[in-house]
Each structure stands twice: as structure tokens, then as C-alpha cells.
Amino acid sequence: AFINVYGYNTVLGMSDDELSLNIVKCWNEFVMLTEKQSVGLVMDPLAAEERKGRNIFSYFMPSSAKKFTVAFLYPKSPDTSDWIYAHDLGRNYLEETFPDQMKTICVNDVTEERTEQVLNDVIRQGADIIFEVAPQMMKDSLKVAVDHPDVKILNCSLNTSHKYIRTYYARMYEAKFLSGMIAGALAENDRIAYIADYPIYGMIANINAFALGASFTNPRARIYLAWSTSENYDRERFLKDNNIQVVSDQDMITPRDPGRQFGLYECSEDGRKLNLVMPLWNWGVFYEKMIQSILAGSYQSEENSEGRALNYWWGMSAGVIDLICSKNVPTGVKRLVDHLKSDIKKGDIVPFYGEIRAQDGTLKNKKDKAMKPEAIMEMDWLTDNVIGEIPTMGELRAEARPVVQIKGVEEKMK
């Protein structure tokens, strides 16, 4: 763990005093890795007393105090990536919500090689909290986190065991389940396309939840899976070869390419695309509640006695995931989806419930049982109504591999 934090060459150059000091700094990381403890999942925000009544910042910051600084590190720019664009909308939401109490800074095009330098730069600029929106930044963040324990660094990824960096994600599979229900109801030939990007933790749950939702409204539905990051990906050929009209594509538009190929849509014979549903990552709500949690002390109190790494995995109940239906969705289908969305928010139903089988027929979940969150997070298999497979590293384009090397589904990436 020590060499992982500081690097082999740096460790060789340390004096005895520096070695002793730095070993103490990263001791908790060493203990966590040697004991192979599981990730502690935080499924919903903790309710804070201070949120009731006065603005929470008034409890901690007098009017004369300097602004709280929150930094965002992006691997690309918002105008070229729908993922970064969604997070940047969240950053803007923070500034609009708390204009007098905090400010944000963002850095675009942060490569893995530049991560440590950029982190130190934003800390020198006064960053109190840092959100990294890509898993490939994790490795080079660990040393900075150990050296600056007063700065809170969070990385947007799932299933990562580090003491000094917490991770966060959102339960998009809840919205995908509902989107799948709509797709199943509208697919006249029972064929539905699901276009995924990276085979990483969380993505497989999204695919499987969509497939289960489709079978809920159409037991004959089959989900044809394609990967946009694979070497031979060709969307139009894939849809034509498989005679597919109903498609689940990327979740959002990007400013540079504001087309209609996002969310769930239907392709007409004349080539037009009829938008049906848009799953929504509401990162503004997530960032607002996370900062409130930190300032209210909940963030610190979540450090449990077991010392496990913490991963925030919030969903519809927290308001960080939603589903927007267009007027093109039939009224009866929309009414059913709205009812089930309300039930998911209340926790009355969960997408992964009852008997679930993988493509090879293996029983993955028993009848009358809800699947445990850890099992959902670590999925490395596809449900029996999915046609396609999880790609290997060699089948991916070169630019996609760094992300997958860090957070790829392990069974296929070995």
C-alpha cells in the first residue's frame, strides 16, 4: 500500500524520518488493503437537523467568512462529453443555489498523468472539497489525499476500497428499469437495442435492470446489446442488421452534438427518431446534499468503527436520479411508470427482485428475495433476455481502455 501511494522511485529517495512520517500517514490505507474489507455503501443521504429551517451554511459560516471552495476535475470538456456536461450542470446548480457562501472552480482535460499536479494546484487555490468525475484519476489522487487529510476528495466511481478517498455514484439502474418497461410496451417486434459505453461497475446493473423492466411489460422482449466503445461499433448497421426500432442510447445530449440520439427513442421507417424517455442524472441535487452533509457533520460521523471505505450510491429516493417521459409515451404506459417510480422512491419495490437468471441459466436471485446492493454493484453477468456480451479489453478502442482497466468488470477484464 505504501509504494502504491508514493511510488517506488519516491520511496527510494526518502530519508528514515520521511519514511516513518509517511508510513504513519497512510497506515489506515495499509490496514484496509491487508484486511480486504468490503466497501461500505451509503444508499441515501443522512437527514441532518440543520437542514430544517435556516440555510445550512448559516450554521457554519458567518457573513464575513471567506467563501467555501469546491473544485471539479473533468477528464474532458463539457461540450464534448454528455457525462461531463451533466456534472457541469451540477456545478452550475451549486453556484446558483449558494452564490454568497461558496464558489466553484473546474479544470477540464485532466489526464491521468496530470491528476496529481492539478490536485495540488486547486488545493493551493483554496479548495476545501474536490470532486473527480472519472475513475482514472483515483490512482494518482491517493498520495495527495494522504498528504492533505483536511481536504475532502471524492471520486465518481463504484466499488473502490480506499480509506482516504470516498467514492460516489448514482443508482441509474432504477431509471433504466422504468425505461425498459416503456421499451417493452412499445417494441412491436419484441426487439430492443441497448447501447452501452464502458463495461464498468454500475453499467451492467443498468443493462440488466433495463432488460428486467422490458420483460415486466413484454415477456417476449429481447435486448440486443452493443458497446459504443468497441472497435467495430456501427450503430446504424447494428440496428438495421437486427431489425430494431426501439433504442436505449446515451443518457444525455452534448452541447457540441445536440442530436436526438439520446435516452430511449423509436426509429421510424423514414429515418426520423421519436424521443420517448430521458433518464436524468441530477448531479446538482447530489452535490448540494453532499456538501450539506459535510457541513452538518454527517460526513464525518459516517466513518464507522469498522473503518471500511465508503461509497455513496444514491438514487431516486434522494432525488439524484429521475426519468422524464415525453408526450410520445402512451398515457396508460406513463401512468404505470409514474406509479412504479413513486413506489421505487418509497422503497416499496426494487428492480432486482424475485427469480433472476443469467444468460447461461444460472440462478442469480431467488424467488421472493431482493438482491443485495453489493451483488447489484458487482454484477459481471447479463440476464437471460439479453443478446450480446460484456466485451474484453482487447475488443475496446484504445481510448476506452484506461477507464476500464481501473473500474472494469473484473471477470471479463482479467
Model regions: which residues?
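Structural motif
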Residues: 103-122, 228-240
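An alpha-beta-alpha
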Residues: 91, 178-221, 225, 305-328
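Segments of small-molecule ligand-sensing domains
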Residues: 2-50, 297-414
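Flexible, glycine-rich surface segments
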Residues: 222-279, 287-292
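Extracytoplasmic "Venus flytrap"
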Residues: 69-90, 94-98, 105-112, 135, ...
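Flexible loop/hinge segments that line or gate small-molecule binding clefts
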Residues: 146-169
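Hydrophobic alpha-helical segments within soluble ligand-binding/sensing domains
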Residues: 169-190, 281-300
